């Protein structure tokens, strides 16, 4: 079978923004209780938010999932080992002992990847099956570049948050050149659509070398975008950019919960 069938979900984050109180955020008791733990993937929206992410993967053709979690995340492990009604997906776990960053989280899933291609996604973002299907059909490294206008107009991401997302510098051949902290002057002057990363990646095994070689960032983390840039600059990685104008539902803080829940209310989930 051609294409990519494995997905790694990064669910180890501390959830600092989710744990912080957001005055007036309309949460029910169950949502408030889980928000206090910071485990965004398990925020209840009729069912855990992560179920919607996994259901979208299954709809897109993926069959094997690895959840990267911390040793303390027993709620996640217990649910997907014993309670979740899995019929289309197999779910494994990889433990990231300490929250050292997204590149370190990817390294935790190396055994699961087993030398093949795999996608990497955030556990607090909902990507539609049409977007994930683009990656499912590929067998070479790629990143989905989301049009900033689409994130604002079609998703739930406010403009001030979009400005904090990195921008993708894409060559005329359609491959990634650089991941920028912010759009450069040339991008802004051009008036053309700016595409950003929402951590929707397709990797092969070459990414693991780069994840091991990068230095700790000024934020004190081993960051996946820095590993990608190192792989491009030093190892000759060619990463295709798939440009889309599509929504992403971003579950960053308590103020996002009600809106995301409403958007997902009619989404049917089959795991």
PLM features: residue spans?
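Short, surface-exposed amphipathic charged segments that create phosphate/polyanion-binding patches used
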Residues: 105-112, 156-162, 255-259
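Conserved N-terminal catalytic core of the sugar/cofactor nucleotidyltransferase
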Residues: 1-37, 43-120, 219
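Conserved core of the sugar-phosphate nucleotidyltransferase
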Residues: 128-209, 214
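Conserved alpha/beta core of the MobA/IspD/sugar-nucleotide pyrophosphorylase nucleotidyltransferase superfamily
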Residues: 2-7, 179-271
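Phosphate- and divalent-cation-binding pockets in alpha/beta enzyme and binding domains
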Residues: 52, 75-78, 130, 227, ...
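The conserved acidic donor/metal-binding loop of glycosyltransferases
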Residues: 123-126
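A structural signal for short hydrophobic beta-strand segments in well-ordered beta-sheet cores
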Residues: 42, 168-170, 241
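Conserved beta-strand segments of alpha/beta enzyme cores
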Residues: 41, 90-92, 175, 238-240
């Amino acid at each position: 079978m051609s294409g990519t069938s494995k997905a790694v979900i990064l669910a180890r984050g501390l959830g600092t923004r989710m744990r912080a109180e957001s005055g007036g955020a309309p949460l029910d008791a169950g949502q408030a209780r889980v928000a206090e733990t910071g485990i965004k993937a398990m925020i209840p929206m009729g069912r855990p938010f992560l179920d919607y992410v996994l259901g979208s993967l299954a709809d897109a053709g993926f069959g094997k999932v690895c959840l990267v979690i911390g040793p303390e995340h027993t709620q996640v492990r217990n649910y997907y080992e014993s309670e979740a009604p899995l019929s289309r997906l197999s779910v494994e776990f990889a433990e990231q002992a300490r929250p050292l960053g997204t590149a370190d989280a990817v390294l935790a899933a190396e055994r699961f990847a087993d030398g093949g291609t795999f996608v990497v996604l955030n556990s607090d973002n909902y990507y539609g099956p049409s977007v994930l299907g683009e990656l499912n059909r590929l067998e070479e490294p790629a990143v989905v570049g989301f049009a900033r206008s689409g994130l604002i107009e079609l998703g739930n991401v406010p403009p001030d948050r979009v400005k904090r997302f990195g921008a993708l510098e894409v060559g005329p051949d359609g491959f990634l050149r650089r991941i920028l902290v912010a759009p450069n002057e040339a991008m802004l002057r051009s008036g053309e659509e700016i595409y950003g990363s929402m951590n929707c990646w397709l990797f092969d095994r070459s990414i693991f070398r780069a994840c091991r070689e990068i230095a700790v960032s000024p934020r004190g983390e081993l960051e996946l975008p820095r590993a990608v840039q190192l792989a491009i600059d030093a190892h000759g990685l060619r990463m295709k950019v798939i440009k889309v104008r599509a929504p992403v539902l971003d579950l960053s803080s308590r103020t996002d919960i009600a809106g995301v829940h409403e958007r997902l209310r009619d989404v049917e989930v089959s795991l």
